[in-house]
Structures are given as C-alpha cells and as structure tokens.
Amino acid sequence: MEINIIRGQNQIGGSIIEVSSKNTKIILDVGSNLDDKEIVVPEIEGLFKGEAKYDGVLISHYHSDHEGLATKILPEIPIYMGEKSYEIHKITREYIKKEYLKEPRVFKSEEQVSIGDIKITPYLCDHSAFDSHMFLLECEGKKILYTGDFRSNGRKFFQSLLDKLPKVDALITEGTNLSNDKIGKINLTEKELEKRGIELLKGNDRPVFVLMAGTNIDRIVTFYKIANTTKRLFLLDTYAGQITATIGGNIPNPRTFFNVRI
C-alpha cells in the first residue's frame, strides 16, 4: 500500500489522505480548512471533479475539518460513515440549512468492510465527536492505522482500545495537542470536570449557564451528572435536544429522561 498526504501535513484539520494498493484507491477524510470563511473545494481530479478514480471515502467523524467537503465528492464514489455520526451530520446540516449526505454506507465498530482489495476495520475511539472511529487498513500483507482525531481524557477507557489494536506497519495521525503539558495547559478528564462542577455548585441555588458544543456528547453527559447530583433541572437548547433525542440510549435526552427538558 502507498500513502499520499494530499492535504493536512502542515496544518490543523482539513485532512485529505489517499491510500492505494495495486487495484484500489481510497480516501481517508475530506475535511474543509478551519480558516476558510467559505467552503473552498480543492482541485483534486477524480475526487471532486472529472471522472471518478477513487473506490471509496472513509469519514472518521462529523467535525467539519474531517468531513466538511463530503457533499462535494463526485456522486459515483461511495462514502462510508458511522451510523450515529451520520445522524448527527444530517441533523447539524439540516439545522444550519446546508446540504447533507443522502445515502452514505454506514459501518459499525469492529465490523470489517472491504473496498476493493483493502480490508477496513473501524474502531470506536474517544473524542469530543460522538461515534468517532479509527481505521485499520489491511492489504498486500501490510497494516496501516489511521487514528482520525482521538483523546484519552474522555469517558471511554483508552487502554481497552489500545489492547484491541494490532501492531501495524504505518501510523497516520495528527499531533496538534501533543505538547500541551509543555506549555502548561491542563487537560481535565471528564470525570475530573464533573467533580469540580459538583464542588462549585453544591450549596448554590442560582441558575447556571454553560457554553459548549451541542454535539459534544461526553460534555453533555458530564453536565447532566453535575445537574443531577446538585438536584437541578437539565435544560438543553433545541439543537442539542434534537441531537441527544436522536442518539437516545443512555445519553441524557428530553425524550426518555424525566429531568431533561428543552
């Protein structure tokens, strides 16, 4: 297999990475640039214009710097995305009245899919975007791991993911926050943030307002736990309410949780 970093090597986000074998070409993520005020579609032949030359595009998660150009891909090229990640992508795009993907091929964690002669296994990973995945690519006796975006301070146990991953021949990753400790920036875990929030709000009956991304599900869970422990009603805006109601399950949402409202 060959790896070609089309974009993203010298910047944060905006990732477009090509992996090819003798018979197959795939793309890992199609992010828009964070600094672009308007979507700028790069002139990539066979992906965004001309005759399609790629066999598939894999989207690791719904943040725009990794999927912002997904709707600009040539329609003949299949797009693969996590099921819940796609649902959040669709809700977000509808909410801001932007075009969304109509029929991507959804995958589930650790269920292998094949694109041509490349086998891909998605692995659920911890990130501020719900349903984020790493991709293990196998072909021609080689293994490549593409991490997408990940962290180790959320609510998922990072070591259990590491234990599942095999040894690989190549690792593709971003390193945008590797040096935080050196510059004195402290990254609290979600559980540490929960503990600090409870300490601050206990014995305080005034309203509390939190500014955060409505798609950061781990953070919503953290502040729900803070509200629940300090006996407060948990209020979400309409966007976050729609996101959490769609995800459902154990995620605090206005549809099934009695103390969550919009």
Where are these regions (language model features)?
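His/Asp/Glu-rich metal-coordinating catalytic cores
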Residues: 1-58, 64-218, 222-225, 229, ...
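A contiguous, basic/glycine-rich beta-loop/short-helix subdomain that forms a polymer-engagement track
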Residues: 238-262
